């Protein structure tokens, strides 16, 4: 009986494999825009969920503190005064937690954008490495033919083999980096490590346009949810000094001083981070301009080479070499522009703007209003 079942299973195996292949072919490939990726990530983020729960907890504490005030008659007593202060502190704490939740969401969104773009960068590198390998393979095959006809030396053939092995290693490394980039991204958006979603958003390159750095610094300070929360924490600590039943007045004074120092330090850190970020963005923009020149030169060189090949003055291998050079130049430019987009995302976050531009396909909209 077992033998018969085995025969039946073996007979059905090709059909099962074909069915599985057909099902895989019919399974639609997951496509994700940047906006969709952010929405998925926020929905499964533990840090965001924790911040939300802390906000909810603070809301309950605020409501309970307000309820306790109803238990007191409208007369003055240390207990009544204490209850009013605790209610005020609970109110402040709720708003602090709300702002910290906002900060967590903004920071997490910035991270998702970075991981999304990192996948695009890794894809570019893997594609460029693949094209380079194709050229190296062509050169290796040509070297083998030349060697078999006694046209090149054994050392020249060995060099071609070494170049091929090196190109294979570069491609393997690029594929590993792509796998790592996908793994990092998939973790954020709640996908399995083996998933390879198609990231369909086009990331525009929009140079930074700043008219007044001081205004940008002030904007960053005025819109920072972390700084807002730190400054409200000072107010909360000041109320401790008014309490009748504060555990230690001296400790409360020190805690207030520490809160004030933290807020001042945060203000200076925001200024420092913004200035460094602006410098880095402008530096990348200079590199982008230089890379654009290299792409243009590579395009012109390839265009001229195609003409020479048509006239029989250049070989296919020489033209392929220029094609790979152009692909490499474009990949270098794309990577710089992607790096710039990551920095601009951090810039929008730091200055309180919408982290995602209203339209990712309209280069005219930079989100810096």
List where the protein language model places each region.
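Bacterial N-terminal signal peptides that target proteins for export
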Residues: 1-9
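Bacterial N-terminal signal peptides
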Residues: 11-19
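Short flexible linkers and secondary-structure junctions
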Residues: 24-118, 234, 238
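Acidic, low-complexity, intrinsically disordered peripheral segments
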Residues: 25-38, 73, 77, 100, ...
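Amphipathic alpha-helical coiled-coil scaffold segments and their short linker/junction regions
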Residues: 38-42, 80-91, 98, 191-257, ...
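Periplasmic alpha-helical coiled-coil/stalk elements that build and connect Gram-negative outer-membrane
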Residues: 60-68, 79-86, 99-101, 105-219, ...
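Long, charged amphipathic alpha-helices with heptad-repeat/coiled-coil character
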Residues: 112-115, 241-256, 273-280, 285, ...
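Hydrophilic extracytoplasmic domains
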Residues: 276, 283, 289-295, 299-301, ...
């Amino acid at each position: 009986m077992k033998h018969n079942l085995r025969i039946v299973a073996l007979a059905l195996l090709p059909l099962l494999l074909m069915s599985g292949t057909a099902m895989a072919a019919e399974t639609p490939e997951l496509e994700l825009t940047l906006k969709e990726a952010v929405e998925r990530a926020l929905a499964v983020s533990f840090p965001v969920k924790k911040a939300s729960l802390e906000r909810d907890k603070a809301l309950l504490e605020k409501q309970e503190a307000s309820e306790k005030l109803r238990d007191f008659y409208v007369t003055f007593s240390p207990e009544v005064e204490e209850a009013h202060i605790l209610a005020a502190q609970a109110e402040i704490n709720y708003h602090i937690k709300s702002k910290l939740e906002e900060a967590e969401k903004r920071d997490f969104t910035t991270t998702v954008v970075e991981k999304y773009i990192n996948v695009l960068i890794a894809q570019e590198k893997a594609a460029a490495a693949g094209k380079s390998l194709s050229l190296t393979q062509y050169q290796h095959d040509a070297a083998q033919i030349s060697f078999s006809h006694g046209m090149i030396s054994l050392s020249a053939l060995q060099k071609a083999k070494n170049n091929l092995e090196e190109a294979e290693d570069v491609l393997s490394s690029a594929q590993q980096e792509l796998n790592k980039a996908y793994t990092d991204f998939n973790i954020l958006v709640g996908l399995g490590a083996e998933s390879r979603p198609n990231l369909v958003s086009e990331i525009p390159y929009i140079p930074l346009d700043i008219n007044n750095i001081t205004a940008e610094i002030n904007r960053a300070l005025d819109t920072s949810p972390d700084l807002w929360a730190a400054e409200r924490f000072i107010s909360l600590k000041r109320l401790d000094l008014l309490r009748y039943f504060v555990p230690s007045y001296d400790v409360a004074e020190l805690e207030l001083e520490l809160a004030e120092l933290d807020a001042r330090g945060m203000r200076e850190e925001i200024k420092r981070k913004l200035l460094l970020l602006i410098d880095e963005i402008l530096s990348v923009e200079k590199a982008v301009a230089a890379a654009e020149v290299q792409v243009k030169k590579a395009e012109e060189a390839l265009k001229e080479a195609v003409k020479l090949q048509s006239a029989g003055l250049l070989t296919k291998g020489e033209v392929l070499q220029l094609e790979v050079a152009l692909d490499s130049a474009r990949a270098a430019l794309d990577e710089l522009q992607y790096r710039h987009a990551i920095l601009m995302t951090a810039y929008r976050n730091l200055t309180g703007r919408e982290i995602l531009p209203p339209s990712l396909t309209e280069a005219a909209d930079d989100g810096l209003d």
